[in-house]
């Protein structure tokens, strides 16, 4: 539920800011999510190149490798492009988290959750770690999950309601419910 809500919010905010289709012609069309000007280019990778370049390269590979994926095929055939709200559903949680980290519109997205960009980033990292442990068969009772900051409103409100404050099991349960 949380993953879909976050993806939907990113896609909606992105389309609002950059448009679902930013060209009058398909001749030189570039999907807005493949346009580096829509990302924060000051964040660098280990080679001192903008992180968004790696992300765009990876997104291009996703598009290339999934030409027969029914939603991609439909939009490409019927509309000539694949909008962000279709594309984002093919991303893993980790890919979506990395996308958020380099977006210029982090504040717009964070506002939907009544969080700061830093709080949402921390929440995404935490959820990504728990999600990966879940997906790969980790034993939760042997895992140590850091307690989330009480300032992260999504989590702290839920924990208060169910009296799970300062509990690793409570943090885990909260994330699973989200």
Which residues are covered by each model-predicted region?
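Long, contiguous internal "core" modules enriched in hydrophobic/ aromatic residues
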Residues: 1-178
């Amino acid at each position: 539920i949380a993953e879909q809500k976050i993806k939907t919010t990113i896609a909606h905010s992105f389309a609002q800011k950059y448009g679902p289709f930013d060209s009058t012609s398909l001749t030189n069309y570039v999907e807005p999510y493949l346009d580096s000007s829509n990302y924060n280019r000051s964040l660098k990778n280990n080679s001192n190149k903008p992180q968004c370049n790696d992300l765009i390269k990876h997104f291009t590979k996703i598009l290339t490798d999934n030409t027969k994926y029914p939603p991609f095929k439909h939009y490409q055939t019927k509309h000539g492009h694949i909008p962000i709200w279709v594309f984002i559903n093919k991303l893993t949680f980790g890919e979506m988290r990395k996308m958020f980290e380099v977006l210029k519109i982090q504040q717009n997205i964070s506002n939907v959750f009544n969080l700061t960009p830093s709080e949402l980033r921390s929440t995404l990292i935490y959820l990504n770690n728990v999600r990966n442990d879940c997906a790969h068969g980790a034993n939760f009772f042997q895992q140590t999950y850091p307690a989330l900051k009480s300032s992260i409103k999504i989590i702290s409100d839920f924990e208060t309601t169910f009296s799970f404050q300062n509990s690793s099991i409570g943090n885990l349960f909260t994330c699973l419910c989200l």
